[in-house]
Amino acid sequence: MTLAAIFAAAMMSFTACEETKPDNGGTTTDENLCPDCGKDPCECPEEYASPITIDGDFADWDALDASKVAVATCSADAKYTALKTVKVYADEVYINVLMEVDADQITSDSPIDIYLNTDNSDNPGNQNWLGQSGQDVLLEGAYYSEGAVVSFDPGLYPYTGSDQEVEWTWDVENPLLAEGNGLASGAGTVAKYELAILIELLNGVELADTFGFGITVSQNWEPVGLLPNDTVTDENTNGAAKFLEVTINK
């Protein structure tokens, strides 16, 4: 071997063993650097992990900070009573919903309608046909169909009615997102069911830090459950109540 070859081999060996000085000023070898951010220790952001898993096991709801969960319970004098309770927990990724249902009232296909008052405004207009006001978008899909519980994967529809009017007016021909595109998922039983709405798929719908939430469940397109609800009166024949206020946990 020539002297030049010996020298080249020695230099290659030295380079392979040479320590690398990272940005933090310490010393480390290449094998200790994070392959993603190139730092030691790793400075990659923590991967998001939802506190709620949509699997029909509701124990993770009990572990939530109760002050972060919005709850509505059926009024004793309500008109539509199939929905007994609804709990809503929202973070920056999901709107999670847990509902308890009177299963005796669910015997056929059961669509869920979820109404979002995106800015939680007190505007008395934009009322749905049951009298809840402030609605901006509708999420509509089934949770019980053809005799079995199914995963909730709704369509997303903008409200197109006149301001200050009580109308059931949605642009169903031009949904913001058609049903079956992964906007939400759900699991559970007829009597107890959880679902999660993926906020990034709301397609341009922006939520204020606190937004309004309403929900109905129907049988053959006739409502049997409504939350929030209230006592039926001559002025409030459907027993509607103001939307539940949900604050996003950031």
Language model regions located:
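Extended extracellular/luminal ectodomain segments enriched in beta-structured repeat modules
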Residues: A90-N96, T107
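Short N-terminal edge-element motif at the start of the domain
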Residues: A63-Y89
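Extracellular/luminal beta-rich ligand-recognition
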Residues: T53-A72, T107-V190
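Acidic/polar low-complexity flexible segments
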Residues: E46-D57, T118-A148, G188-V190, L201-K250
